[in-house]
Amino acid sequence: MAQVLRGTVADFPGFDERADAETLRKAMKGLGTDEETILTLLTSRSNAQRQEIAVAFKTLFGRDLLDDLKSELTGKFEKLIVALMKPSRLYDAYELKHALKGAGTDEKVLTEIIASRTPEELRAIEQVYEEEYGSSLEDDVVGDTSGYYQRMLVVLLQANRDPDARIDEAQVEQDAQALFQAGELKWGTDEEKFITIFGTRSVSHLRRVFDKYMTISGFQIEETIDRETSGNLEQLLLAVVKSIRSIPAYLAETLYYAMKGAGTDDHTLIRVVVSRSEIDLYNIRKEFRKNFGTSLYSMIKGDTSGDYKKALLLLCGGEDD
């Protein structure tokens, strides 16, 4: 049965954008800032509602809400609030643009977003990217990456994955055999074969291929990728496989490793929590609890502090005991 996806943030009932705009203005006016009011209000409104508040704020006060928030807040808390204020349809495109901009490429961001978004989502991202930045996402990716990693990204950006339909067992067998021949049975690796199969077959078909692969080879496909590839390509192929198996489980793992060990990858923490808060953050929480023996809520609690922590916990939407 298909998993029902649930976010942790939804439209606020009885929403009044003018009242909210006034509350925010009061929280930032004069000496000192009432961070508590700002974070409580913004985390309990949907992204569409936050956009309406920004319009009302400008209408009532002739001021830009985002500029005011930026000048009143600092550090990670500011970054989180700024992310919440970005229109959701722009957010992924914005993150990709910044991953490609300037010296060095942030492959981690490219991999995470491009591997875990559906073909429909990717098409929407590409359209917004072009409207906002006046260049094609695919061209920018090609200009900033190379080799098989680049080719896999380009295949995914075509967003031409087969739609889910009745599974053809003969084709499943053929693909599983082809992957086995291209990796474990070959001196060297036929990366092209992995790229084509992973990038174009339907999700339900690939799940069967992974099971069949295990039967034929005695290995999980992840183990083979680990042995046969390396670097950015390995990370991308693994992200694709994990997303095919379960997007919420893949993103739960992404969050776990953003916080595990010394230091926290706050950029990833903010990006995943904000971008999934209205899509599947509830499912991500459940997978997190199941796979890591602790809850997302308690890990955020132990890993962050101050208003930043309070806001993240409100977005997380509850504890999973």
Swiss-Prot record:
One of its GO terms (cellular component) is vesicle membrane. The modification N-acetylalanine is found at residue 2. A motif ([IL]-x-C-x-x-[DE] motif) lies at residues 314-320. There is a cross-link at residue 29 (Glycyl lysine isopeptide (Lys-Gly) (interchain with G-Cter in SUMO2)). It holds the Pfam family Annexin. InterPro entries: Annexin (IPR001464), Annexin_repeat (IPR018502), Annexin_repeat_CS (IPR018252), Annexin_sf (IPR037104), ANX5 (IPR002392). The modification N6-succinyllysine is found at residue 290. It comes from the Eukaryota. Monomer. Binds ATRX and EIF5B. This protein is an anticoagulant protein that acts as an indirect inhibitor of the thromboplastin-specific complex, which is involved in the blood coagulation cascade. This is Annexin A5. It comes from Bos taurus (Bovine).
